[in-house]
Swiss-Prot record:
Guanine nucleotide-binding proteins (G proteins) are involved as a modulator or transducer in various transmembrane signaling systems. The beta and gamma chains are required for the GTPase activity, for replacement of GDP by GTP, and for G protein-effector interaction. Involved in the abscisic acid (ABA) and ethylene signaling pathways. Regulates basipetal transport of auxin (IAA) in roots and hypocotyls, and thus modulates root architecture (e.g. lateral root formation). Residues 21-100 form the G protein gamma domain. Disruption phenotype: Hypersensitive to auxin-mediated induction of lateral roots, within the epidermis and/or cortex, attenuating basipetally transported auxin and graviresponsiveness. Enhanced sensitivity to glucose. Abnormal roots architecture. Enhanced susceptibility to necrotrophic and vascular pathogenic fungi, such as Plectosphaerella cucumerina associated with a disturbed expression of genes involved in cell wall metabolism (e.g. lower xylose content in cell walls). The modification N-acetylmethionine is found at M1. G proteins are composed of 3 units, alpha, beta and gamma. GPG1 interacts with the beta subunit GB1. The dimer GB1-GG2 interacts with NDL1, NDL2 and NDL3. Binds to NUDT7. This is Guanine nucleotide-binding protein subunit gamma 2. Changing C97S: No prenylation and loss of cell membrane attachment leading to cytoplasmic subcellular localization. The lineage of its organism: Eukaryota, Viridiplantae, Streptophyta, Embryophyta, Tracheophyta. The gene is GG2.
């Protein structure tokens, strides 16, 4: 009786392995089909969208037309004596520093 039961359990386990293999293949196929549907939907959405370059150009135009709120607007030097610190000397002979 043991020989018969061990033989039938061996066949049963063989069927389980085949079923699990089938199930894995079906699950993988279902996942791939779902991914394909997702990509098709995404492609349809992209086809309906405007070109990015047109949107970027419009955005850049709006940004360029407005001054930066964090930078002060100056029309010229407020105090002309400050310019001496940012400009080089007018004559090389007057310069006493070794850098310039």
């Amino acid at each position: 009786m043991e020989a018969g039961s061990s033989n039938s359990s061996g066949q049963l386990s063989g069927r389980v392995v085949d079923t699990r293999g089938k199930h894995r293949i079906q699950a993988e196929l279902k996942r791939l089909e779902q991914e394909a549907r997702f990509l098709e939907e995404e492609l349809e959405q992209l086809e309906k969208m405007d070109n990015a370059s047109a949107s970027c150009k419009e955005f850049l135009d709006s940004v360029d037309s407005k001054p930066d709120p964090l930078l002060p607007e100056t029309t010229g030097p407020v105090n002309a004596t400050w310019d001496q610190w940012f400009e080089g000397p007018k004559e090389a002979k007057r310069c006493g520093c070794s850098i310039l």
